[in-house]
Amino acid sequence: MKIFDYEDIQLIPNKCIVESRSECDTTIQFGPKKFKLPVVPANMQTVMNEKLAKWFAENDYFYIMHRFDEEARIPFIKHMQNSGLFASISVGVKKAEFDFIEKLAQEKLIPEYITIDIAHGHSDSVINMIKHIKTHIPDSFVIAGNVGTPEGVRELENAGADATKVGIGPGRVCITKIKTGFGTGGWQLAALNICSKAARKPLIADGGIRTHGDIAKSIRFGASMVMIGSLFAAHEESPGETVELDGKQYKEYFGSASEFQKGEHKNVEGKKMFVEHKGSLMDTLKEMQQDLQSSISYAGGKDLKSLRTVDYVIVRNSIFNGDRD
């Protein structure tokens, strides 16, 4: 098995067939809807909130609302659907969450997307939740995770998941690999690659994205959608406190299993950091799209499919050659 991560890989260009990168199509059909980009902000409190979720839906971008304000979920679904927008929510696997799914069914509230969101998704509890959702609200598109193995992908798909999230602790504010010794940190792209060999349904690459080029690499190695946390954090529109440090503006960014999210120091697998203020989120999305269009042009195609078949070389952490200094 080849082991590598994003910084170890360089994709090899093919002959360009477009006059301009603007001809390249970055749209993706994911579940019942088509989106402008194959990216989704991480469903974290310092990355996504209701206001941003509405803006993303209005502008044909995918989003997943976090699950850390449980009482707000039903009003959120109603508000989004009454506004003619899609509802995309997260659930956990505790007993109350099973009751919540039944309540949605009773009220005939059908979110277009439901993400089962726990750190170790290859588990009986997630499999039971997938089956529970598919029994009570079968029309919802179910995303389950997170996993890091082909066996995990197969089991969640067999249980009824419509898509699977791949990634155990590779994110900047996730310390699972340090606290537990387990995870895909340092080999996330290889984990995605081996999981894609088993997948029959879409995969979401979750974690470890440091540059826009990593989006193209994720698609090459099997992702349909790419979940991004730190690159989407710390914008003008982002949730989170703004602080000034040494004359520069920063915003807080913390992991979903951090004590800052949990409100207690118990089973902590996330940390908090401050990310330098990045300006407008709209500008970042525009740049992300342009960079992905350039990736498609280098791949010798006109749409995302062309990225899936390009050749690559493994260069072992050398592609930056001091560019980060």
Swiss-Prot record:
EC main group: oxidoreductase
EC number: 1.7.1.7
Membrane spanning residue stretches: none
PROSITE patterns, alphabetized: IMP_DH_GMP_RED
GO cellular component, one term: GMP reductase complex
SUPFAM superfamilies: Inosine monophosphate dehydrogenase (IMPDH)
Catalytic activity: IMP + NH4(+) + NADP(+) = GMP + NADPH + 2 H(+)
Domain of life: Bacteria
CDD domains per record: IMPDH
Molecular functions per Gene Ontology: GMP reductase activity
Keywords: NADP, Oxidoreductase
Pfam family, one: IMPDH
Keyword set includes tRNA processing: no
GO BP: purine nucleotide metabolic process
Residues that coordinate or bind NADP(+): 203-226
Active site: C174
Classification via NCBIfam families: GMP_reduct_2, PRK05458.1
Biological role stated in the UniProt entry: Catalyzes the irreversible NADPH-dependent deamination of GMP to IMP. It functions in the conversion of nucleobase, nucleoside and nucleotide derivatives of G to A nucleotides, and in maintaining the intracellular balance of A and G nucleotides.
Family under the similarity heading: Belongs to the IMPDH/GMPR family. GuaC type 2 subfamily.
Protein name: GMP reductase
Species this chain originates from: Staphylococcus aureus (strain Newman)
Taxonomic lineage of the native organism: Bacteria, Bacillati, Bacillota, Bacilli, Bacillales
Name of the gene this protein is made from: guaC
